[in-house]
Structure formats: structure tokens, C-alpha cells
Amino acid sequence: MKFLLDNCFAPRVAQAIVALRGDAVVHQHDKFARDASDEAIVQALAREGGWTILSGDLNLARQRHQRRALRAYKITVFSLAPGWLDLPLWEQAAKLVRRWPEIERAADTAEAGTMVEIPVSPAAPFRRLAR
């Protein structure tokens, strides 16, 4: 399982997880051109297989056509709930690192193409988003 952290995350947050987890985690800037479209990124990840996207883009969860495309390409997405990106960088990184084992377990068991929301509260369970 490989994880791509999208541009909503500071590259330093991805680097912190890489330092702890290893090369199974990549920031979007390290894999794709800055002007790469979401569609091109999803298609490339689908061709390679085995990718899960971690996104702070709330539109992914809200726009039905994007959810359909991700499901069609069998890309699982973990989307941050509203409020995550309002946190200071250190707190955002700490919460993400704290939940990382849970994210990996959920990614291992999620049906390909599923969208899952990660709440800000560490006590709250992950929530599968509507298809």
C-alpha cells in the first residue's frame, strides 16, 4: 500500500510521515508536476495500482462526479474533515501521525474506490462517505 498526500498538505507533513513510515508515503509535489490535473494524477495512480490518496480537498467528498471517477479508477481516498486544515501545522502533523496506524488499517480493509472521512477529533471514528 502506497499513500499520496495531496497539495493540501504541507510537504513537511509528508516528510514527517516518511521519516516514521518509510517510502510508502509520497507528497504530490514529489511525484507529479505542480500543474498536473487531478484527473491526470488519478489516472497515473490507477495505472500503477496500490495507491491510496490522503486529501484535504473537501470538494473531493462533495462533488459526485469526482467520487464516481475515483470509484471507477478504484482509488481509495481518505479525506480530512472540515477543520483539519485550520489547525496549526504542528497540531495537524501531530494528529495525522497519531492516527496513521489507524489510517493504514482502514486502507488495508477498505473496498477499492471507497471515500473515508477522517474527523479532527482523535476519539471520533472514521466515516465512510456516500457514493
Where do the language-model regions lie?
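Charged phosphate-binding loop/patch that engages nucleotide di/tri-phosphates or the phosphate backbone
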Residues: 102-131
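Acidic, metal-binding active-site segment of PIN/NYN-like and related structure-specific nucleases
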Residues: 45-66
